[in-house]
């Protein structure tokens, strides 16, 4: 039996552009879960059969828009708190890079786009560490770049 080749948690990174150094991306510490959801909004059109108008029509779908949503949760390092707060307080989007480590043959590369921090939540339970939950929504294109061969 051949096992599937997989990626570790650390090999799937969420990086925010530094607020002080343009073009430098930094992974905020503390997220123990993260996910990226790619969606398309579709428009449905029922297209009839011209030879048999009584037959059920088939639905055809056209892409109207695309969007990417990032979510994450975990404990938040105090060192990461100022960057998240700055991203929320700003009315401008943040440049975000989503890294998948590995070479091109292994599916490595990254997505790059601008995102608004749309949700920023702290939580606390007695006896546990303070938690952080975030959600980011893309604005404009999110472009994939293959890793080097």
Description of each model-found segment:
Residues 71-73, 95-97, 135-137:
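Residues within well-ordered beta-strands of beta-sheet-rich folds
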Residues 19, 41-45, 75-81, 101-104, ...:
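Generic structural motif
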């Amino acid at each position: 039996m051949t096992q599937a080749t997989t990626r570790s948690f650390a090999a799937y990174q969420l990086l925010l552009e530094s607020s002080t150094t343009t073009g430098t991306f930094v992974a905020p510490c503390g997220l123990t879960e993260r996910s990226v959801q790619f969606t398309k909004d579709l428009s449905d059109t029922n297209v009839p059969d011209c030879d048999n108008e009584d037959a059920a029509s088939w639905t055809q779908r056209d892409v109207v828009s695309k969007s990417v949503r990032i979510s994450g949760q975990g404990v938040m390092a105090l060192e990461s708190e100022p960057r998240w707060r700055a991203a929320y307080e700003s009315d401008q989007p943040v440049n975000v890079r989503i890294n998948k480590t590995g070479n091109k043959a292994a599916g490595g590369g990254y997505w790059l786009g601008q995102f608004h921090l749309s949700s920023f939540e702290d939580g606390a339970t007695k006896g546990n560490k303070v938690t952080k939950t975030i959600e980011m929504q893309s604005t404009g294109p999110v472009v994939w770049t293959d890793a080097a061969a």
